[in-house]
Design a protein with these regions (language model features):
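Short beta-strand->loop structural element characteristic of the AMP-binding/adenylate-forming
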Residues: 51-53, 60, 64, 68-99, ...
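Conserved pre-ATP/AMP-binding loop-to-beta segment of ANL
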Residues: 10-11, 131-149, 156, 177-183
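Conserved AMP-binding/adenylate-forming core of the ANL superfamily
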Residues: 11-57, 61-65, 82-87, 165
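Structural core segment of the AMP-binding/adenylate-forming
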Residues: 37, 41-42, 65, 69-128, ...
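AMP-binding/adenylate-forming catalytic core of the ANL superfamily
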Residues: 81, 98, 314, 334-338, ...
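Conserved AMP-binding/adenylation subdomain of ANL enzymes
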Residues: 168-183, 191-231, 245
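Conserved AMP-binding A3 loop
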Residues: 24-26, 145-169
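Gly/Ser/Thr-rich phosphate-binding loop
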Residues: 204, 226-235, 244-302, 313, ...
């Protein structure tokens, strides 16, 4: 595809980087071919795994494209990796070549990584002679393009095998609104599917991208205007909330943004979209699949992830894979009518792959419900569901309510065993600096927001909530620790909640 775009639009701008470097389609193709030849001269061949451990910028995109130009497999590493996590990923993928930032290589010292043989810290020093490149090896859409590592909350990171067709499909689904020649601002990392699919979409649409090192509330709008970006790689989680805190200005809507994919969409994010004058949509995605659920543009804030996109079939099932009636809660499973546009399994983990793909459907591990119109609503991760006195409780919903309490900075909610073999709700809270935190006031605040059985019995205050390498809270830590000596007990404090009698 890069060759095609370089032939059709050689002088069209394709890339802009934060350091001021730019590529046209032709200059990008020329550099990619030179690096591909340099890697080929160092015995990188089709199917080889090549680690790329670099921050966002020209070198990582150049490395990614050159690796794939040879048909080799791009294996990006999170720049936060260190210690045993880093050792596990390197050994699991089994690559022998790494392109790394020089400041990161000291983390390799002391690790047992016997298969890793060559580590290069200067991408430009590897540029070779493009005329000597052997590019005769065909690349098929079912070949593995990359291995993206996803952090689990209960076990080691798993490498998701992503074929070329999955990368293409994810790009055109997530950013299908991008028009020919438009620019996309990318502030997600290149070890994240949101980052790679954004660049792929720019290539598919003959557009351009502006890659910055990360999301910045203070620089976001300057970057949008500098790059004349009509969209971004997405506003995920609290990004929109952070941007909304800026003082309103008369020219807020005077910006080039036209449309954004946001996760989630609610009243606050819609107000944000209206304030800054862009259209929005949302959906559901994970590294393993190619955005199976999408809403219409400017859908109402009903909490829905939309409907299955064209070419995707979805079901909600029980623990035996039996489809459940609408309105009930079940696991989302999905499959495609075209092979290879979802993951090809977990690298080196045949049992995990078989579990995820059992009965010919990919099991997301997420609980959803479906309304009478066929729209899907996210409820919780299966392992994050709490069972209390016959009721299934969504930790996601309880966390959202607790976040509204003014003194809460971060929160995770887990189930802990109780005396009757089910669970009680534990809220682990990192409070904001300031006044002392009173758990009783939190319970009073939550009473009108949540069903009585959803309100936490236990509240524990912590200084930090541990995260995975991809910044997800490690809930398993608090499940394993259970009720600690510093945990506040609502019932011991004399606060008992009862079901309202009608």
């Amino acid at each position: 595809m890069l060759d095609s775009r370089a032939a059709r639009f050689p002088d069209r701008r394709f890339a802009r980087f934060e350091d001021g470097t730019q590529w046209t389609y032709a200059s990008c193709r020329d550099e990619v071919r030179r690096l591909a030849q340099g890697l080929q001269a160092r015995r990188v061949r089709k199917g080889d795994r090549v680690f790329v451990w670099l921050p966002s910028g020209r070198p990582i995109v150049l490395a990614w494209f050159a690796i794939n130009y040879l048909g080799a497999v791009y294996v990006p590493l999170n720049t936060a990796y260190k210690g045993k996590v880093l050792e596990h990923v390197i050994n699991a993928a089994g690559g022998s070549v790494m392109l790394a930032h020089p400041s990161l290589t000291e983390r390799l010292q002391g690790l047992q990584t016997p298969k890793l043989q060559q580590v290069f810290t200067d991408v430009d020093a590897l540029l070779g002679d493009a005329s000597a490149l052997d590019d005769s090896t065909p690349i098929e859409h079912w070949d593995i393009q990359c291995i993206i590592y996803t952090s689990g909350t209960t076990g080691p990171s798993k490498g998701v095998l992503s074929p070329y067709l999955q990368g293409y499909t994810t790009a055109v689904v997530n950013y299908g609104y991008l028009q020919d020649g438009e620019c996309i601002l990318i502030n997600l990392p290149m070890f994240h599917v949101g980052g790679t699919s954004s660049i792929t979409c720019a290539l598919v649409r003959s557009g351009s991208f502006y890659l910055v090192e990360g999301f910045s509330t203070t620089q976001f709008w300057n970057q949008v205007r500098e790059g004349q970006c009509s969209t971004t790689s997405g506003l995920i989680g609290v990004m929109a909330a952070f941007l909304s805190k800026a003082e309103p200005r008369a020219d807020d809507a005077d910006n080039p943004l036209k449309y954004i994919t946001m996760f989630p969409v609610n009243e606050e994010t819609i107000a944000f979209a209206k304030r800054f004058g862009f259209d929005y949509l949302t959906g559901f995605n994970m590294t393993e699949v190619s955005t199976p659920l999408m809403t219409d543009m400017n859908a109402p804030p009903d909490g829905s992830c939309g409907w299955p996109r064209s070419g995707i079939e979805c079901r909600l099932v029980d623990e035996n894979d039996i489809e459940i009636p609408r309105g009930q809660i079940g696991e989302l499973i999905c499959r495609s009518d075209i092979p290879w546009n979802m993951n090809a399994g977990y690298d080196g983990l045949p049992e995990a792959t078989a579990r995820a793909w059992r009965n010919g459907w990919f099991h997301t591990g997420d609980l959803f419900r479906q309304d009478e119109q066929g729209k899907y609503y996210f409820v919780d991760r299966i392992k994050d569901t709490i069972r209390r006195r016959g009721e299934n409780i969504s930790s996601f919903e309880v966390e959202n309510a607790i976040r509204q309490f003014p003194q809460v900075d971060e929160v995770v909610v887990v189930g802990v065993a109780n005396e009757v073999a089910e669970q009680d709700v534990l809220a682990v809270i990192k409070p904001k600096a300031g006044d002392p935190f009173d758990p009783a006031k939190l319970i009073e605040f939550l009473s009108p927001l949540l069903a009585y059985f959803m309100i936490p019995r236990y509240v524990r205050l912590v200084n930090e909530i541990p995260k995975t390498e991809t910044n997800k809270p490690r809930k398993v830590v608090f499940r394993d620790e259970g009720i600690t000596a510093d945990t506040w007990d609502r019932e011991k404090a004399g606060i008992r909640l009862r079901r309202e009698r009608l």
